Amino acid sequence: YEIRLSLVGSEMCIRDSGYIIRYQAMATHEYANIPQTRRRVYIVAFSDLELSDHFSFPEPIPLTSRAMEWIKLDERKPDIYYYSEDTVFDRYIRDTVTNRRYIYRVFNGAARVLTNGKCPTLTASMSTPRNAAVLRDDFGVRRLSLRESLIFQGFPAEFHFPNTIKIHDAYKQIGNSVSVPVIRRIAEEIQRII
């Protein structure tokens, strides 16, 4: 109810300003051909009724790959991504994450396998090892790297964070982002009617 009430409040405020609202819940794996479970509400507002009438959200597209096809299991990442033997929690994660075919979701310290072939929703809280997307590669159990997280959000390969951004903050920014291809498709629909 909280999400709906928040949306209703925002909708009323925007409508009171003279805009026509269009919104739709869209999942990255359904609208971007990226295997990430990420459903978000996208809102488009028009000041012109005719433009609003001609706008339509993009149609779903088929998902053609599984998350683990996007991961190079034979490529070692920096040590910062790997769970060690140093703590009870790290040992628990290493013992739990056993299947190399899936990405696991660690949330509030508990690991759960996602057998749907998708990457779990990338969130701002994934900046900590207790809330992360985790997998087993040829070298051990680790979190998704920043680059892999950017890929699952649809960022172009040439995108890089400045060296001044801490890894913790970069994960937060990725988790707070919307998937780039979904926004691009919505923008293309807006451009089509303008």
Model-assigned labels for residue ranges:
Residues 1-14:
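Single conserved hydrophobic/aromatic residue that forms the stacking wall/gate
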Residues 4, 28-33:
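Short histidine/acidic/glycine/proline-rich micro-motifs that form metal-
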Residues 19-30:
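Conserved S-adenosyl-L-methionine
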Residues 20, 34-194:
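S-adenosyl-L-methionine-dependent DNA methyltransferase catalytic core
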